[in-house]
From Swiss-Prot:
A Pfam family per the record: YbeY
Keyword Glycoprotein set for record: no
Keyword terms: Cytoplasm, Endonuclease, Hydrolase, Metal-binding, Nuclease, Ribosome biogenesis, rRNA processing, Zinc
Family matches, as HAMAP family: Endoribonucl_YbeY
Top-level taxon of the source organism: Bacteria
Cofactor note: Binds 1 zinc ion.
E.C. no: 3.1.-.-
Encoding gene per record: ybeY
Protein name stated in the entry: Endoribonuclease YbeY
Length: 158
């Protein structure tokens, strides 16, 4: 199983080896979750100013956040299946603030890579339909992301 990934660092502040690590982590998470071969995901690294604009425009919240996901494969009520639906899905976009990732890595006492990995997996699970609107959903999603990160080898001490 292999994702088609487009990873862009608009800030130019994330080293290439970390971007490559994000790609490996997403491939690992996709395999763990049984995602269809050829599914597409984009990851964009931005600064706080840019993610605040996106957060305000799409979520009505005028402050920077750490990660935002836009799932493209959500089935709405009454939607008709499109011809070619057997093609690999375009799962969506994950947008991560490198500024927030740095702040949170310092706050939690772990590496920037661990925080970027956490935010990447968190965003990816949202693309797969996981959420944390209820206590039950939160427990399921947070357990899943912890399992993926630990199996990959990116634990809190990383």
């Amino acid at each position: 199983m292999s994702l088609i990934l487009d990873i862009t660092d608009e800030t130019g502040r994330v080293p290439e080896d970390r971007l490559a690590e994000i790609e490996k982590l997403l491939q690992f998470a996709a395999a763990e979750e049984g995602v269809a071969d050829g599914a597409e995901v984009s990851v964009t690294i931005v600064n706080n100013e840019e993610i605040q604009k996106i957060n305000k425009e799409y979520r009505g919240k005028d402050y920077p956040t750490d990660v935002i996901s836009f799932a493209l494969e959500e089935d709405g009520e009454g939607e008709v299946e499109i011809i070619g639906a057997d093609m690999p899905p375009v799962l969506g976009d994950i947008i991560i603030s490198v500024d927030k990732a740095r702040e949170q890595a310092e706050e939690y006492g772990h590496s920037l890579m661990r925080e970027l990995g956490f935010l990447t997996v968190h965003g990816f699970l949202h693309l797969l339909g996981y959420d944390h609107m209820t206590e039950e959903e939160e427990k399921e999603m947070f357990t899943k992301q912890k399992e993926i990160l630990n199996r990959y080898g990116l634990s809190r001490s990383s």
